[in-house]
């Protein structure tokens, strides 16, 4: 079933987040998905958008040759950086696109990049878990949410949290970031 979906008509690449955005943890079929993409030469972009608000993300890129690109935004771990649109992209091979062009002609927003670098220098990848772990556990407990590896997501049930279903049957991801304000 999964192979049929991944090999869908016109599929030229796969974008997958880690942790997976719908579950708040690494996708349960991540290994299988990567094997299928490798076997069928489907290039993968690994989106680490939740990197700075997640734990247990350990991916050895050497184990997954289909992963050709890794991206990471700094907007989720660092409040206010969403206004600066700053992140990092790593590619195995040169990509002739708008990002490369802006970098080559030195038109990237240096102020935003410098701000992102300062945040990374001053806050560890574990900062948000260290700061919000206790509040996260309390909010999840008070709202009957299952913990995830992403400090802003809890998983609910179909009775109280049906409105939070994002398309995966039986999955109800609840964003609790507003309840974590300190």
Kindly label every feature range from the protein language model:
Residues 1-182:
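PLP-dependent class I/II
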């Amino acid at each position: 079933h999964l192979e049929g979906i991944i090999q869908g008509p016109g599929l030229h690449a796969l974008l997958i987040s880690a942790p997976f955005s719908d579950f708040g943890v690494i996708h349960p079929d991540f290994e299988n998905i990567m094997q299928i993409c490798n076997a069928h030469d489907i290039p993968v972009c690994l989106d680490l958008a939740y990197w700075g608000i997640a734990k247990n993300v350990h991916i050895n890129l050497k184990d997954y040759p289909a992963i050709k690109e890794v991206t990471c935004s700094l907007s989720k771990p660092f409040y206010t950086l969403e206004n600066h649109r700053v992140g990092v992209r790593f590619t195995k091979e040169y990509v002739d696109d708008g990002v490369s062009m802006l970098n080559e002609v030195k038109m990237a927003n240096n102020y935003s990049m410098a701000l992102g670098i300062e945040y990374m220098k001053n806050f560890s990848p574990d900062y948000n878990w260290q700061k919000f772990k206790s509040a996260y556990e309390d909010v999840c407990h008070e709202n009957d949410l299952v913990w995830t590896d992403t400090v802003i997501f809890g998983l609910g049930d179909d009775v109280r949290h049906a409105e939070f279903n994002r398309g995966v049957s039986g999955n109800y991801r609840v964003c609790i970031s507003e309840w974590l304000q300190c």
